[in-house]
Amino acid sequence: MTSTKLIAILIASMFSLFSNHVIAENHKIDMLNKLGKERMIYSKKVISINVNDEITWKSVDKGHNVEFIGLPEGASKYKSKISKEAKYTFSKSGIYLYQCTPHKAMGMIGLVIVGDDKSNLDKIKKVRVYGKSKKILKSLLKGL
């Protein structure tokens, strides 16, 4: 193997490793008591991201958290502490349904679609939600 070919292979390998780290993004979602006319709400109800992207949920107003209640096969369950910033890196593609545990009946839910994979949509539709979350989830899923 010539030194030129070896250098080209090394550069291509380094670029490949570097580009995987550059592509991952950190998305921000605020946990709020009020946004416009809506109460007990995440600043984004639905977000589409890539595999290995991270979401940071910021507790702008106290008393909120993030709890996954529906997720793709093989994904890790997650529940953050109340009133604390939450971070999660999404390594599995699919739909994630999450809620604010204290405000689940008030409709404080959200969806993350990872990798444009909706293969677990039927599973998400079967997740039991309460109160106002029933109507909101139905509306969010209709929009997918």
Describe each region flagged by the PLM.
Residues 9-15:
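Hydrophobic helical h-region of N-terminal Sec-dependent signal peptides
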Residues 22-144:
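Extracytoplasmic copper-binding redox domains, predominantly the cupredoxin/blue-copper superfamily
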Residues 1-8:
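Bacterial N-terminal signal peptides that target proteins for export
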